Regions:
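Cys/His-clustered metal-coordination modules, chiefly Zn-binding fingers
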Residues: 198-304
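Interaction interfaces in information-processing and related assembly proteins
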Residues: 1-230, 298-304
Length: 304
């Protein structure tokens, strides 16, 4: 069964997207060995990125979310594309903090709110990425993403995200939903939507009780006669490769490659998102760089 759905109200004025991201967050926890609080923080960001990525119009488009709040967890990053793949990382995955007075994990303090949320959109039809940036509201992720839509894209949006972590640090459930109002929404529709969402249990309560993204849609859009537009599977999937990593090294330029070679001719690159390791002989890379440079020079100034 697909873990993400997109829906629309009967009159076309309200868009809904919901996801059960439990398996995504479980894989992230396994890869990064996160503490409970960091699992919640990174899991929320991955879930939010998944929801945003589902709105991309082209499979080759990408969104990168970067949260730098000055908290002990450090910088959090999540990347997603139009095909349902998402990946993420966190600077300090082992940071743990006391729970808040209500017993909830203190994600806001771990992330911090003295900083910014940066949203980078790579659109294949544009030469340069579009970058939006807003101050963090709380560091709790959902409020910060909602604020981004309000101030950077001027789209009335509600986003709810949740990650439930067990005592053994395993992920019991994770997910979220996003509701957006299209132009022309009436005050009555806005009031009804607010009442619906305020009356809903939390995302983790719903998922832990066996509810689905479609169930969340029916609750959030009660009275709007929503219909499911489409559904698909979302996965934690890193797109790194030996070839892409080699191209990244070559792009550093000859001087940097020489400096690195002089320190150690054997280079190991570790992916931040999946911890895959790639080994390179820098002498061989320098030879390849020189061959490419010579070929480029010959193409620019061919021998007559």
């Amino acid at each position: 069964m697909a873990n993400l759905i997109r829906g629309l109200s009967e009159n076309g004025g309200v868009v809904f997207c919901g996801v059960d991201s439990t398996e995504i967050v479980r894989k992230a926890e396994k890869l990064h060995t996160t503490s409970a609080t960091c699992s919640a923080a990174l899991g929320r960001l991955l879930t939010g990125a998944t929801l945003m990525g589902s709105m991309l119009k082209d499979d080759r488009d990408r969104i990168t979310l970067r949260v730098a709040g000055g908290g002990p967890a450090g910088v959090l990053i999540a990347c997603t594309d139009g095909t349902g793949n998402v990946k993420g990382c966190i600077d300090n995955p082992l940071v743990e903090l006391p729970a808040k007075a209500n017993g909830h994990l203190d994600v806001g303090t771990a992330v911090g709110k003295d900083g910014v949320l940066t949203v980078i959109r790579d659109n294949r039809l544009q030469k340069e990425p579009t970058v939006g940036q807003v101050p963090l509201v709380s560091g709790e992720i959902a409020e910060d993403l909602t604020s981004y839509y309000a101030y950077s894209e001027q789209v009335p949006t509600v986003m709810a995200l949740g990650v439930l972590v067990d005592k053994d640090l395993s992920i019991l459930c994770a997910g979220g939903f996003m509701v957006q109002l299209l132009p022309g929404a009436t005050d009555a529709e806005i009031d009804q939507l607010e009442k619906n969402i305020n009356a809903m249990p939390s995302v983790t309560e719903l998922l832990h009780a066996g509810k689905t993204p479609e169930d969340m849609m029916q609750l959030a859009l009660a009275g709007f006669d929503p219909n499911v537009l489409d559904e698909r599977d979302e996965h934690y999937q890193c797109d790194c490769s030996a070839e892409r990593t080699k191209e990244m090294l070559l792009s550093l330029g000859r001087a940097e490659l020489v400096r690195m070679r002089d320190e150690d001719p054997n280079c190991e690159v570790v992916c931040h998102f999946c911890h895959s390791k790639y080994q390179y002989d820098l002498n061989a890379l320098l030879a390849e760089y020189d061959a490419q440079a010579a070929q480029a020079a010959e193409a620019e100034h061919p021998v007559q």
